[in-house]
Amino acid sequence: MTATRTGALAWLTPWRALILPFVHPEEADAISAYFTAHRFIVDHQDARLAIAACGGASTCERGTTDTRADALALMLFARRVRKTGVALHVSGCAKGCARQAATPFTLIAHAGRYDLIVDRTARDAVTNNAKRLDLAAARETLETMARNAGRRRELERQ
């Protein structure tokens, strides 16, 4: 759309980013509005930037859960926990393809339920069926952990 309407060059990066290097300033607002309306990330404060999620069941034979939808349900939590960078990795399996680095919180899917690990990678996880949480329980556990961490930081400042 943009390249056709504006005659601009458009590049798609391996990181799923679209670069429009030669947009005329007078067209920037209209282009931004178009991409916003189509649910692209156009603001560096967008809460979706605080999460990493694999394609899940709809895109991977190993995935058993709709990880992207679950990640979107948790994105505001992730942004509250960490103002910049990735705070939450939602992985469809123990491979952890969406993020290889350690993340403050990682949820690893197992048929609609999640293992929760802290400050490690999905590949570091030791599975334990007794700890598997549904999305609501995972959200509640994450919120509790974040509140407790905030209290600890407050006590350390005193």
What are these regions (language model features)?
Residues 101, 106-158:
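Mobile "lid/hinge" segments at catalytic clefts and subdomain interfaces of large enzymes
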Residues 1-111, 115:
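Small-residue-enriched alpha-helical segments and adjacent helix-cap loops
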